[in-house]
From Swiss-Prot:
Catalytic reactions on record: 2 D-sedoheptulose 7-phosphate = D-glycero-alpha-D-manno-heptose 7-phosphate + D-glycero-beta-D-manno-heptose 7-phosphate
Organism: Coxiella burnetii (strain RSA 493 / Nine Mile phase I)
Residues where Zn(2+) binds: H60, E64, Q174, H182
Presence of the UniProt keyword Membrane in the record: no
Family label: Belongs to the SIS family. GmhA subfamily.
Listed name of the protein: Phosphoheptose isomerase
GO CC entries: cytoplasm; DnaA-DiaA complex
Annotated SIS domain residues: 36-198
Taxonomic path: Bacteria, Pseudomonadati, Pseudomonadota, Gammaproteobacteria, Legionellales
CDD domains for this protein: SIS_GmhA
Length: 199
């Protein structure tokens, strides 16, 4: 396979993954978007976390909330727990990397808030501890996962929502997570900003 064929292959595999996800994920995406919109309407906030590319996804979501998505609107309260290098490195140094998100949630999370937890594998210890911390604080969890959901799946409660991409490839999962994040932003805007219905 030459490089031109490889690029075409990657596009085709990404399309296949998204196509397979349509029937499986529309319902949980809508449920999660509505849950997030209600959270914001009730004057609560959304915290997000992930590692590596998933950390970038967490920041992507929070930036769309704080700035705007495709509609002019007020800022919505959202915070990526991945961005404060001083806090993350202090917790990792003094305690452990597994606690870099959970300790922030213990200080920042409140009942009625939502945690957006992003993990392609579902096995990241700091994400697992973040979910446990969120539950202790009375928060609901929206989890973006892939593969078989990993250990993360076993921690979710009946009021939590998992959006699991039906793929094994980390790249394909992350590409679909980006689309899911845009879908969530679109739902939130349409629920909270009537003028967004026109776009």
């Amino acid at each position: 396979m030459n490089l031109f064929q490889r690029v075409k292959y990657n596009f085709e595999e990404s399309i296949k993954t998204k196509t397979a996800a349509i029937e499986l994920l529309v319902d949980p995406i809508v449920q999660a978007g509505e849950l997030m919109a209600q959270c914001l309407l009730n004057e609560h906030k959304i915290l997000s976390c992930g590692n590596g590319g998933s950390a970038a996804d967490a920041q992507h979501f929070s930036s769309e909330m704080l700035n705007r998505f495709e509609t002019e609107r007020p800022s919505f309260p959202a915070l990526a727990l991945t961005t404060d290098a001083s806090t993350v490195t202090a917790i990792a140094n003094d305690y452990s990397y597994a606690e870099v998100f959970s300790k922030q949630i213990a200080g920042l999370g409140s009942t009625g808030d939502i945690l957006l937890a992003i993990s392609t594998s579902g096995h990241s210890k700091n994400i697992l501890q973040a979910i446990t911390a969120a539950h202790i604080r009375g928060m609901n969890v929206v989890a973006l996962t892939g593969r078989d959901g990993g250990e993360l799946f076993t921690l979710l409660g009946t009021d939590d929502i998992e959006i699991r991409v039906p793929a094994e490839s980390t790249a394909r999962i992350q590409e679909t997570h980006a689309l899911i994040i845009h879908c969530l932003c679109d739902i939130i805007d349409r629920k909270l900003i009537p003028s967004s219905e026109d776009h």
